[in-house]
Amino acid sequence: LGIIFADLNGLKDMNDTFGHAKGDQLIIRAARLLQESFEDGLLYRIGGDEFIIVFEGMDQFRFRDYMDKESHIIEKDSIFVSLGWGWTKNSASRERAQLDAEQMMYHKKAEYYRTHDRRRSS
């Protein structure tokens, strides 16, 4: 069982600058981008700007090969999504895989903001 934890970058700025209606549109666009990028998985919105993509029946090596081809941040049309992933042999360990994915995603999100904030101030 492979799990990707995805979080939209910049939603707070969008909401603060343009309002929540524009922020909602950004969430919809991000969901479509994730569906297109990970069509082999099942996409779930777990709240706010966070999503999980679940890959059932995929062995560890295939999942890792699949993820090695992906970036830790998806960027398209001014949408930036930070990603983390985890894998487990059985669904009983799903929480562990989800936690691994979430921790990796937060690390990548912090990395994104360090780089993004540096570019802004230059």
Go through the PLM ranges and name each one:
Residues I53-M58, W87-K89:
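Short beta-strand-to-loop capping motifs
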Residues D13, T17, G41-L42, K76-S78, ...:
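N-terminal hydrophobic or amphipathic segments with adjacent small-residue motifs
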Residues E36-D40, D65-F80:
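Short catalytic/binding micro-motifs of nucleotide second-messenger systems
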Residues S82-G84:
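PAS-family sensory domains
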Residues R64-S71, G86-R120:
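Catalytic-core segments of nucleotide cyclases and related cyclic-nucleotide turnover enzymes
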Residues L1-G2, N9-E36, Y44-G48, I52-I53, ...:
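Conserved long alpha-helical elements within nucleotide-processing catalytic cores of c-di-GMP signaling
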